[in-house]
């Protein structure tokens, strides 16, 4: 229905897809097929959403308070984009950074990555001029060559890239 309405982007918070077995995997693959055919960006499923600290847009149910002053501060400072395949890590690390008055640009929970991957979000975050640090929490990469290209681009732009690769959970 959303594809027929030409919806450009969707956040799917719900779990029970690929991580839930064969039936869930089939449903997730169908979502990916629809998204690709419609040119739709999908965050998730099985994610906690994302927070754009620069434009004060929290697309999440995680408690966040971004005042106009905080957004202006974040935009004026060299800041951090935190991209995570784990929703819990996204919420905890973003809150911890904010509590320490470290400026953030984005905090993203990619979830199962049915149609948009951590590499997509990394490439987007690289384009934000005020973002100076790209911090990633990732168990796997669907497009390792794109990751390496993004790392080279970050180096060219003088941006730091930090990766925590925890392995299997």
What is each of the regions a protein language model found here?
Residues 1-169:
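Catalytic-core regions of core metabolic enzymes
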